[in-house]
């Protein structure tokens, strides 16, 4: 474990309300539903488990931590939600918007904690971030889309068009594209859209978009994230750089990315789960945007495209891949 991640776990444990010995003597049942497996969401899940471990929970002893993935299929997410609710765990955790929505729709009684959800209000998970009134609260990973556009502009000063591939069936993706359009308009930049309803469609959509755009923006869309290699391959074939909304896209060939450390997001989510296990009501746990973001640069990917990364970006980057 990296030192920064270990520090995040320790810090989260120190800041959280101490878990009582009597509470830890019982087995806490936590059921996690994740829409699809990809590096960012997997990191969030790992951070969640490590965060709980740092608070004194041990899998197989005083913690029953269950996990299922919907393999990118919202219908499977609904099935998982129904199964979990029937098992009556102490806390349900939905990783990403579709899984969180499925859990929230399946119960009004079992506490639901969401994480890695772009727009909790738009997704109808909560009506008010500051004052959740039902059985649902958690963490948003709303991307700083305006900063992503500024990042693309810094990399390509003469930028006139940004391409984006997304799944219109994901509420989070629709929100991000709307924010992208607003930010791009302020810079006089045209947005070229390509849609992909499933992972298998991402590369073909990217092939079309890449030939019409100066850069491709890869949002924190779960469909795109699960097929990021195909998107980057299509972009590279057209000599079009990729800017990522998640730093998890950097190893796949994104030239630059600004986004959350999803492991840290998971650790922060553990605070919510532990609070519920300690008996705190959902109404006392405001939903909020996760803390912390990183700028990462893939200089090797840039060089393959004949791009020189500005020193201003390199100086600010917390991670550089050569």
Predicted regions and their residues:
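Short hydrophobic alpha-helices and adjacent helix-cap/hinge residues
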Residues: 2-11, 18-19, 24-322
